[in-house]
Amino acid sequence: KMQKGYYYSSNRDPELLESADHIGAMAATRTEQKLGAKKISTQRLPIVFSSRVAPGLIGHLLSALSGKSQYEKTSFLNDSLGKKILPSFVSISEKPHIIGGLASTNYDSEGVTTYNKEIVTNGEIAHYILDGYSARKLDMEPTGNSGGVTNIRINHNDQSLAQMISPISKGLLVTELM
């Protein structure tokens, strides 16, 4: 069955972009890794998500922590400040002032000063992501996030993918989501 894969490079400095040859080779490798894929039966298995799946998962998490989702009560994480939602080894922070960062900014789209913040600390929700309107609706202070989050950083355990999957005799490695 035909498969497709992708790979890309992004940077503010064009000189730091990966070469077209490397990008093509990585896309080809990822495509080849999908050959022979097949459905599995329903079962309970340990799951490991590859790092390239993380942005999508983290994006859904951050959306659930947005002020709008909170005041509209449409989030699967309603009223979750201080609650543990992830393993203790996971922390998620926002660093809006990284020099050369793709999304670095001193102010959000409402003119509120941005600042470093922990969104999730040791698996617990530390901050919602608030613009001025949602902050007022929730009787909280704006977090400098009108227009979204910037330069998200995820602290996690230092194991490589190979180290994470080596103790698993039968499991599922998720490399892409639909």
Regions found by a protein language model. Name each.
Residues 8-14, 65-72, 134-147:
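Extended active-site and interfacial segments that coordinate phosphate-rich ligands
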Residues 9, 19, 50, 66, ...:
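Alpha-helix initiation/capping motif
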Residues 36, 54, 67, 73, ...:
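Glycine-rich, flexible loop/turn motifs
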Residues 67-86:
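Amphipathic alpha-helical
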